[in-house]
Every structure is written in structure tokens, then in C-alpha cells.
């Protein structure tokens, strides 16, 4: 794990130097917002691609791609506003008020539809009033689990303030605990990933974006917490996912730069050859 942490820390410095600090803050925030929203919602079954998510960000509901539902569009738009809310509140500690407001924004236009057949109505920003299940997992007594939420938030904030544990480890451990509390009627996965990134951003770390293509690996890492009584697999997954993304973006930027330079050299050579021919 120490080698992985060291590799991550070295790469973060390179990533900031070569990628994030070279872009304007506004552009980098929007770039991350689109990627994160598209992939986080894709994990939950949303079919919007990154390009379609970008179009939705730029044009809103006036340009919903063919074959996409209004529910999917609202899910993405709500994710945008929840993410932007957290960005504006990075100086605030982890509290129930922050968590509930983020959930309210995240599910504002989708919760009533998704829970329309519930006997008891669910409201955005309010805890579940029934026990929860997801996939093949049945969670514990909802009242007992909800009582643990303030404790989780408080202990996570204390560890953050101490500065003794790596931010990625804190983000992963919080995520693992939170997902098994599952305190809201819907949106727990998206909210958990938002709050993990809130933790990382508070410590000036790059955003963790779990690609939709890695959904099964991600779910397996979460299940290991219950199966093996350890969050080591999730911590490892968080580190490796972030490392892979940073390496890919650094390499992509390098290749695009080199290709552009080679292209310009080709143009100059062609122009030089044409000039030579015209002189004959």
C-alpha cells in the first residue's frame, strides 16, 4: 500500500503541473463536472454518454439527445447542481445539514418519479422511512443505520482535520461505511461518490472518477467490505482508478502535443517543397 500511495502522490504533482494547473480554473471545473456526472450516473444505469452530457450542460433541456429520457436528463442536471453546491462549500465541515442539502439537490427532479409507488412518499433531502436493499444486498434496520450517520460524518471530519491519514484512504473508508448505511430512499451511490470527492477536493486532490465500464469491479470492491470485513480492496480500487485516470490524461496531452508539432513540421516541409518547385 505504501508503494501505491507514493506512486499516487508523485503522479498527483505531475498531473497538477502538466494538466490541471495549465487550464483555467473554470474550464477544468467544467471538464471534471461533465466527466464525473456522466460516469457516476452511468454506474446507476443512465445511458447518457460523456458527449451527450456535455451537450446537456451547454444547452440544457432544449437539446435532449434522441433515445434519451427526460428522467435521465434530470438525473444528470441534478448531479450538476449537487456537485456545484459542494464546490462552493469546500470550507464547510462534513455535517448532516451539508449531506441532506446535497441529497436534496441531487434528487430534486427525480425522487418523486422513482418512488411514486411507495406507500409513504419520499422527499429529497430526507432520510428513508423504510429498510433498504440494492442489487443482492439487504441493508440493516434503517432507523439504527441512520443514527450512525452523524457519527460517521463527525469522525471523518476529525480524521480530515488531523492530517494523519492520506485523503484517498479517508475518502474510500467514508464511502464504504456510507454505502452500507444507505440512509436515503434513492441516490445513495451518487451521493456517496459526491461526498468522497468533496473529501478529496477539500485536501486539493484530483477528482476520483470511476468509469461506468468499471462498475462491476467497483461493486465487487464494495461487497468485499461485508464479505471479508475489510475495506482494503476499496482503498486499493480508489488509488488505482485515480492513478489510471491521471496517467491516461497526461499521456493523452503529451500525444496530442507531439502530433500537433509533427503536423506543423509536415506543413512547413510541404510549403518549403512548393517554394522550391516554384523557383524552378
Predicted ranges, named:
Residues 1-280:
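FIC/Doc superfamily catalytic core
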Amino acid at each position: 500500500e505504501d508503494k501505491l500511495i507514493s506512486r499516487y502522490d508523485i503522479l498527483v504533482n505531475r498531473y497538477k503541473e502538466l494538466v490541471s494547473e495549465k487550464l483555467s480554473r473554470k474550464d477544468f471545473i467544467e471538464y471534471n463536472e461533465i466527466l464525473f456526472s456522466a460516469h457516476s450516473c452511468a454506474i446507476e444505469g443512465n445511458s447518457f454518454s460523456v458527449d451527450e452530457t456535455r451537450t446537456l450542460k451547454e444547452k440544457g433541456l432544449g437539446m435532449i439527445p434522441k433515445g434519451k429520457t427526460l428522467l435521465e436528463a434530470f438525473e444528470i442536471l441534478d448531479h450538476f447542481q449537487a456537485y456545484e453546491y459542494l464546490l462552493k462549500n469546500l470550507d464547510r465541515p462534513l455535517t448532516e445539514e451539508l449531506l441532506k442539502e446535497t441529497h436534496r439537490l441531487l434528487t430534486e427532479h427525480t425522487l418523486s418519479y422513482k418512488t411514486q409507488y411507495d406507500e409513504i412518499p419520499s422527499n429529497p433531502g430526507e432520510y428513508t422511512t423504510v429498510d433498504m436493499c440494492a442489487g443482492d444486498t439487504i441493508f440493516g434496520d434503517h432507523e439504527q443505520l441512520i443514527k450512525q450517520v452523524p457519527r460517521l460524518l463527525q469522525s471523518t471530519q476529525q480524521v480530515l482535520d488531523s492530517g494523519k491519514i492520506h485523503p484517498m484512504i479517508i475518502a474510500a473508508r467514508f464511502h464504504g461505511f456510507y454505502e452500507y448505511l444507505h440512509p436515503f430512499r434513492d441516490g445513495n451511490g451518487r451521493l456517496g461518490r459526491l461526498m468522497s470527492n468533496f473529501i478529496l477536493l477539500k485536501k486539493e486532490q484530483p477528482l476520483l472518477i470511476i468509469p461506468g465500464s468499471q462498475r462491476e469491479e467497483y461493486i465487487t470492491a464494495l461487497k468485499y467490505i461485508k464479505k471479508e470485513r475489510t475495506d482494503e480492496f476499496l482503498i486499493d480500487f480508489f488509488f488505482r482508478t485515480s492513478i489510471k485516470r491521471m496517467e491516461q490524461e497526461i499521456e493523452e496531452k503529451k500525444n496530442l502535443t507531439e502530433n500537433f508539432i509533427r503536423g506543423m513540421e509536415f506543413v512547413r516541409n510541404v510549403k518549403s517543397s512548393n517554394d522550391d518547385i516554384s523557383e524552378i
